[in-house]
Amino acid sequence: MATPMIYDALIIGGGPAGLAASLALARVCRTSMLFDSGEYRNEGAKEMHTFLSRDGIPPHDFRATCLQQLEKYKDYAYVTNTKITDIANTDVAPGLKGFKAVDFTKKEFFGRKLVLATGTEDVLPTHIEGYKENWPVHIYQCPFCDGFERKSYPIGLLTFPNPSYSHLALMLRPLNKDITIYSNGPVPTDEPTQTALKMVLAAGVKLDERPVRRLINNGDGPENGISIEFTSGATVKLGMLYHRPPTRSRAANLILQLGLETNAIGDVITDTMMLKTNVPGCVSAGDTQENMKQASVAAATGTRAAASIVFQLADEDGKKALAEAHL
């Protein structure tokens, strides 16, 4: 039986974080196997934004460009389209601790280190008719990613459940002063939320508390936009609607298997500088651990995760050489 290859790192996730980690490792001749499940948070989005030199690029084209550039490093950067279902921190060779990953076909892969960069997914509400049909073509969650191209049209903010929505409302005002909060019923009466609401109303943001019956996709482009139909009164038409659905990790099962520590919303806890987790040899990058879930930030953390692994590998190799030299 052939001895399985042990990569310097296994990278789970084919988004900006995982791709950046693969590139950085290859640049210093460290081998990696990247697993791309084909699941992406920005699936359905027509363009990526706020990514220097790639502003406006379709996500599919961005990934294709990344993979094309990785071909230069084919002796170091390996990529396979599969989904990892099981992961273990275990011996991968006599006296060598590492990670064993198993994909959905039961194929096994081994690595000295692990980059967990599976990302997150948005949990879309199911109780609002038409929401899914408008996401992410007319409903957005990040003004840095989407909005500039539609700034000439009225803006809506769906719900106002807590004070954090005041920041989003005020961030949107420079795009267009015609912005309305559609709270889908009464705004919560707790003091922090009401104080935040008073602040945005004082800034000129309007409030409509009518219950929403359904959201209507009027067609492509802001000139068609999205309409909100209420249980009573006139329908309104907008160029775009902002809403922040909760997110969940795509790798909840892997996080559980490894015993990784997470915060209250399920993101993996890492140290700020080296992105190390509580499991030695495992680092996390991108939306899996980052509060600011954006492509450019994810790519930056992927590079940092790779550097962290390179430092660890170099240190281990040096200590091994010293021990074997008996100096």
Curated annotation (Swiss-Prot):
InterPro entries: FAD/NAD-bd_sf, FAD/NAD-binding_dom, Ferredoxin-NADP_redctase_2. Disulfide bonds join C142-C145. Pathway: Mycotoxin biosynthesis. GO terms for molecular function: oxidoreductase activity. Its EC number is 1.8.1.-. Coiled coil: none annotated. Gene3D superfamilies: FAD/NAD(P)-binding domain. It is an enzyme of class 1 (oxidoreductase). Induction: Expression is regulated by the cluster-specific regulator verZ. SUPFAM superfamilies: FAD/NAD(P)-binding domain. Keywords: Disulfide bond, FAD, Flavoprotein, NADP, Oxidoreductase, Redox-active center. It comes from the Eukaryota. Disruption phenotype: Completely abolishes the 11'-deoxyverticillin A production. Its cofactor is FAD. Binds 1 FAD per subunit. GO terms for biological process: cellular response to toxic substance. FAD binds at residues 14-17, 36-41, 49, 84, 117, 287, 294-295. Homodimer. Belongs to the class-II pyridine nucleotide-disulfide oxidoreductase family. Thioredoxin reductase; part of the gene cluster that mediates the biosynthesis of 11'-deoxyverticillin A, one of the dimeric epipolythiodioxopiperazines (ETPs) from the verticillin family that act as mycotoxins. 11'-deoxyverticillin A is required for normal conidiation. The nonribosomal peptide synthetase verP is speculated to be responsible for condensation of amino acids to form the carbon skeleton of verticillin, whereas the cluster-specific tailoring enzymes are involved in further modifications leading to the production of 11'-deoxyverticillin A. This is Thioredoxin reductase verT. It comes from Clonostachys rogersoniana. The lineage of its organism: Eukaryota, Fungi, Dikarya, Ascomycota, Pezizomycotina. The gene is verT.
